Amino acid sequence: MEKMKAKHIPRIDIHDRIELKNALPLRTPYVIYIDPCDTCNFRCKFCPSGNLELMKKTRGRGHGPMDFEMYKGIIDSLQEFPDPVRVIRLYKEGEPLVNPRFADMVRYAKASPKVQRVDTTTNASLLTPERSLEIIDAGLDRINISVEGINADQYRDFSGHKMDYQQFVDNIAFFYDHKKQCEMNIKINGDILTPEQEEEFYRTFGNITDGINVERTIEYWPKYNDMKVGFDEGVSLLGGAANPVY
């Protein structure tokens, strides 16, 4: 492997990390996830958000970009906590940059005395130079970029998205060149790569990011598909009646 600027680090943010067992009970949450948009412009094979038919059947999904006034209310409500929240994570199920006011969301959170850091995870397909400058100037502390292939054909096959791959790489390089305070990390699913393609991934992105990583999937629940597990949508995780609020 050729020498590169980036360090091999996971996308998990371990900034100022404290073991939870030594901090309980918490006075204030360490991390709060807020989904700027619960829909995505990709149709990745591994992700439920890319399955349009499934999302149509799923209660509470398909709202699109979060209303900015609702978002402001969430950030304002953090005043009720005694301490600042360590991280506001602007990412959950959808693609954050589908929300046209993403930079405003970053800026509003960073202006709050109850927020220490703001980060996000994105597929970066909408990360144009103009939006990059907006997001950086808003004060984003960390951006994780999920790469889904090493060429346009692989992207189209894996994520159902047609793109100008070289422009995609150039846009990421632009963000890196102008990132100021923002820490940058790029990762890819190594299960879709040959050893030669993995080397190409490092050559392409290894000098335009702070951190880089090839992730591997593991079997989280062995033999799950062989188990006969009943599921009742009317029952909550705690055993009571499920009463979704939309």
Residue spans for each PLM region:
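Accessory C-terminal segments flanking Radical SAM cores
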Residues: 2-15, 19, 24-35, 197-203, ...
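Conserved C-terminal portion of the radical SAM core fold
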Residues: 82-91, 111-119, 136-151, 165-228
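A residue-level structural signature of the nucleotidyltransferase/glycosyltransferase Rossmann-like core
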Residues: 63, 147, 243-245
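Conserved alpha-helical substructure of the radical SAM core
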Residues: 2-142, 154-157, 162, 166
